[in-house]
Amino acid sequence: TYKPSKARIIQCENKATAKKALKALKDGTDPEEVASQYMVDSATYSGKETLITTKKTDISTRMINKLYKTKKAGVIDEIFTNESSGTTYAYVAVLVTNTYKDIKDEVYTTLSSDDDVKKACLVYYLKKYNFEVHDQDVFDNLKANNPEYLVSRPDLAKSKD
């Protein structure tokens, strides 16, 4: 599942900085103002509203689950860490909403522009309607470029990792 929620996340260099940012957020300071003061220079998350799903691999699963399960919008009283490219960053978050009806349009837009989702949907329908290729040129092209679409030949659809 994608566990969507909308949050303002601030990426900090370490836990000590994140602790200061969390205190400022709890004191009522605007997340973008807190971010400008405490975020790491190369931050992906800078206090702006962001749709968070399980597709986001640069933040911890624990944060995604916490945002998804929290009942009330506001500052999440916890510091999250995640190692990214050999560097450990600390994050603080403010939940904007995790109510599906409030973010469904954004979730729809995000998922419909995701190549993995598009591919999975196409494969689903190709299987459902027993897609077969009888033209050798088309078959060869699909075999070379998109073997997962050859659903009638699952032996070819496997990736060669």
Predicted regions mapped to residue ranges:
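PPIase-associated folding chaperone regions across multiple families
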Residues: 1-20, 36, 58-161
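Extracellular C-terminal loop/segment signatures of secreted glycoproteins
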Residues: 48-57
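Residue-level recognition of short, well-ordered coil/turn positions
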Residues: 29-30, 72
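Short, well-ordered alpha-helical segments enriched in acidic and aromatic residues
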Residues: 31-41
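Non-transmembrane alpha-helical segments in soluble domains
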Residues: 22-26
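Intrinsically disordered or highly flexible coil/loop and linker segments, enriched in small
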Residues: 30-31, 44, 131
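Gly/Pro- and small hydrophobic-enriched strand-loop and loop-to-helix capping segments
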Residues: 40-48
